[in-house]
């Protein structure tokens, strides 16, 4: 959503992506995907996401990086919150646990606040998802304008990520139609 907001008025014309699936393929997903989108004015932006990080990775769940490069500016987003680091001789809990998996060793370094939705503290939920939920609720109750993605934004972005997956699967650049709905 944010990448498209920052490039308002520009339309994606193609995507080229590569994926690897050496670890998580047994669960039907990719370890990591890297994609480069080209916009109608030549601007390019890259996005990579990796779910198969080492079990001792200090971030909670994944690594996400987004870069937008243009002649008028550059933005580089690294979304693992490496600015708040805890290092301890006492092992920290897993960054993410599920009912079926528990990592075999503790993590001694932790990127605090790196869980995407936020953190639980004192029985309360804090972080980006709390703020987004509260402002969304305010929008519903009061009609106040908020900076949330629209359903159309979400649909377009879903189709763009699907095109990214298709590019990785077919190992070729995917030229995007004017109407994203025409691709799927």
Q: What are these regions, as identified by a protein language model?
A:
Residues 34, 39-41, 57, 63-152, ...:
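C-terminal glycine/acidic-rich active-site capping loop/insertion
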Residues 6, 139, 167:
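Conserved catalytic core of Hanks-type protein kinase domains
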Residues 13-14, 171-174:
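Short, well-structured active-site flanking segments
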Residues 155-158:
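C-terminal interaction segments
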Residues 160-170:
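Short arginine-rich
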Residues 2-6, 135, 160:
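Amphipathic alpha-helical segments that form well-ordered structural scaffolds
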Residues 1-63, 152, 183-184:
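Rossmann-like dinucleotide-binding domain that binds NAD(P)(H)
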């Amino acid at each position: 959503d944010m990448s498209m907001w920052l490039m308002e008025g520009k339309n994606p014309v193609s995507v080229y992506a590569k994926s690897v699936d050496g670890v998580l393929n047994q669960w039907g997903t990719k370890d990591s995907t890297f994609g480069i989108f080209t916009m109608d004015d030549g601007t390019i932006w890259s996005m990579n996401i990796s779910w198969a990080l080492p079990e001792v990775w200090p971030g909670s769940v994944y690594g996400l990086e987004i870069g937008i490069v243009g002649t008028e500016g550059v933005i580089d987003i690294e979304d693992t919150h490496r600015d708040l680091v805890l290092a301890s001789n006492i092992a920290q809990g897993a960054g993410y646990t599920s009912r079926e998996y528990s990592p075999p060793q503790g993590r001694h370094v932790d990127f605090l606040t790196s869980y995407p939705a936020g953190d639980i503290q004192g029985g309360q939920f804090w972080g980006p998802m709390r703020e987004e939920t509260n402002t969304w609720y305010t929008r519903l109750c009061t009609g106040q304008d908020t900076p949330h993605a629209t359903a159309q934004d979400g649909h377009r972005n879903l189709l763009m990520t699907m095109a990214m997956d298709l590019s990785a699967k077919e190992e070729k650049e995917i030229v995007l139609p004017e109407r994203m709905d025409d691709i799927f």
